[in-house]
């Protein structure tokens, strides 16, 4: 049982997933701070000093904090858009690397092509 767990835990996909979750959590905190500490106050200034986190109403004895919900929606869209831009950038880098690999042929392959062409010429002369 221990060997199975060890092989599962050391498998590349599990480690990659764990690293992704940790980095994603840290990235989420950065974006949340960006939204809460920079963007929302600026948006509040543009809207006449409106503070979204203070928006609420009382229903019976419950306080409904819809301003915090609006702020969470803004966080979601900014995080989603940031991740989209990051993935798009990484995809372009991968595509560029793939094109560079195709553009630079392997020297051995070129040598083999030359040998093949020389053999064809010799065969055609005979």
From Swiss-Prot:
Keywords linked to the UniProt accession: Cell membrane, Ion channel, Ion transport, Membrane, Transmembrane, Transmembrane helix, Transport
GO CC terms: plasma membrane
> Origin, by domain of life?
Bacteria
Pfam families on file: MscL (PF01741)
Membrane topology value: Multi-pass membrane protein
Q: Which InterPro entries match?
A: Mechanosensitive_channel_CS (IPR019823), MS_channel (IPR001185), MSC/AndL (IPR037673), MscL_channel (IPR036019)
Which GO MF term does the entry hold, naming one? mechanosensitive monoatomic ion channel activity
| Localization | Cell membrane
Transmembrane ranges, per UniProt, are 14-34, 40-60, 67-87
- Indicate the family of this protein: Belongs to the MscL family.
Assembly mode: Homopentamer.
Q: Which HAMAP family match?
A: MscL
Function noted in UniProt: Channel that opens in response to stretch forces in the membrane lipid bilayer. May participate in the regulation of osmotic pressure changes within the cell.
The name under which this protein is listed is: Large-conductance mechanosensitive channel
Q: Which organism is it from?
A: Bacillus licheniformis (strain ATCC 14580 / DSM 13 / JCM 2505 / CCUG 7422 / NBRC 12200 / NCIMB 9375 / NCTC 10341 / NRRL NRS-1264 / Gibson 46)
Gene name of the record: mscL
